[in-house]
């Protein structure tokens, strides 16, 4: 009992001394609370920063897609065919070719989400080779995929969503005959093919299923 009295007396004396000298310290619980608050604030700042970056990239992607689409149609449509692109390297070369021709800037040819050039594939229209083209944007998260498709989908008559960081010619199908089925959330979700169930944002199933699968995703936006 005497020992407890001595301990309490020492604690009281120390607290009084700390108050007088201004050296009052923080308890472990107080430290934990402060660190917890700092962690929550930091997480919030990171989240807001990421949203700001995504929003900026989304705006840039829409601008770049529009610029490249205009450049492709103005440069090649009157020629009757688009340059053949057998693989991803050729698709990148086609994008770089537009830069070399002065049709777009190097920055306009880039995928803002990856910092690399967007791939531009030529693909069939009604079984005729190289009559259509698709601009691909890869390396997308599911959220980025959904936002990009819903943001710029009206600019293009053909949209194909693919799981994976890259696309290939074989993934695209045919501009005129590949039937869209937006209810699947992947593959061709918008097309001019008869019988297509094109993406409709007023259809809840289409919205829920959009960009179904595992990230990363690649979206191909096509025209002819």
UniProtKB/Swiss-Prot annotation:
Give the transmembrane ranges: 26-46
Kindly list the cysteine pairs connected by disulfide bridges: 145-211
| Propeptide residue interval(s) | 1-25
Q: What happens in the null mutant?
A: Deletion mutation abolishes Vibrio cholerae colonizing capacity. It also shows loss of observable pili.
The protein's UniProt keywords, in alphabetical order, are: Disulfide bond, Fimbrium, Membrane, Methylation, Transmembrane, Transmembrane helix
Give membrane topology per the record.
Single-pass membrane protein
| Localization, UniProt | Fimbrium; Membrane
Summarize the record's induction comment: By ToxT that is required for tcpA transcriptional activation. Mechanistically, interacts directly with the tcpA promoter to mediate activation.
Cellular-component GO terms for this entry? extracellular organelle; membrane; pilus; type II protein secretion system complex
The record ties this protein, via InterPro entries, to: N_methyl_site, Pilin-like, TcpA
Q: Which Pfam families match?
A: N_methyl, TcpA
Q: What effect is documented for mutating residue 145 to S?
A: Loss of autoagglutination and pili
Where is it mainly found? Answer: other
Q: Which residues carry this modification: N-methylmethionine?
A: 26
DNA-binding in keyword set: no
A GO biological process of this protein is: protein secretion by the type II secretion system
- What does it do? Major component of the toxin co-regulated pilus (tcp) which is a type IV pilus essential for bacterial aggregation and subsequent colonization in the host small intestine.
User: Can you name this protein?
Assistant: Toxin coregulated pilin
Give the lineage.
Bacteria, Pseudomonadati, Pseudomonadota, Gammaproteobacteria, Vibrionales
């Amino acid at each position: 009992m005497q020992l407890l009295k001595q301990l309490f007396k020492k604690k009281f004396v120390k607290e009084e001394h700390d108050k007088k000298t201004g050296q009052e310290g923080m308890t472990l619980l107080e430290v934990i609370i402060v660190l917890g608050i700092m962690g929550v604030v930091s997480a919030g700042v990171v989240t807001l920063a990421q949203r700001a970056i995504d929003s900026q990239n989304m705006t840039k992607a829409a601008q770049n897609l529009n610029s490249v689409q205009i450049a492709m149609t103005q440069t090649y449509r009157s020629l009757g065919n688009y340059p053949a692109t057998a693989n991803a390297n050729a698709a990148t070369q086609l994008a770089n070719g537009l830069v070399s021709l002065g049709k777009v800037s190097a920055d306009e040819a880039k995928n803002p989400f990856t910092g690399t050039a967007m791939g531009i594939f030529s693909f069939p229209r009604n079984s005729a080779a190289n009559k259509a083209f698709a601009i691909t944007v890869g390396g997308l998260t599911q959220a980025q995929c959904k936002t990009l498709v819903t943001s710029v989908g009206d600019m293009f008559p053909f949209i194909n969503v693919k799981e994976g960081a890259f696309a290939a010619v074989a993934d695209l199908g045919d501009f005129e005959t590949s039937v869209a089925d937006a209810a699947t959330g992947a593959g061709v979700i918008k097309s001019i093919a008869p019988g297509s169930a094109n993406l409709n944002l007023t259809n809840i199933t289409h919205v829920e299923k959009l960009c179904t699968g595992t990230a990363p995703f690649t979206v191909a936006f096509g025209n002819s």
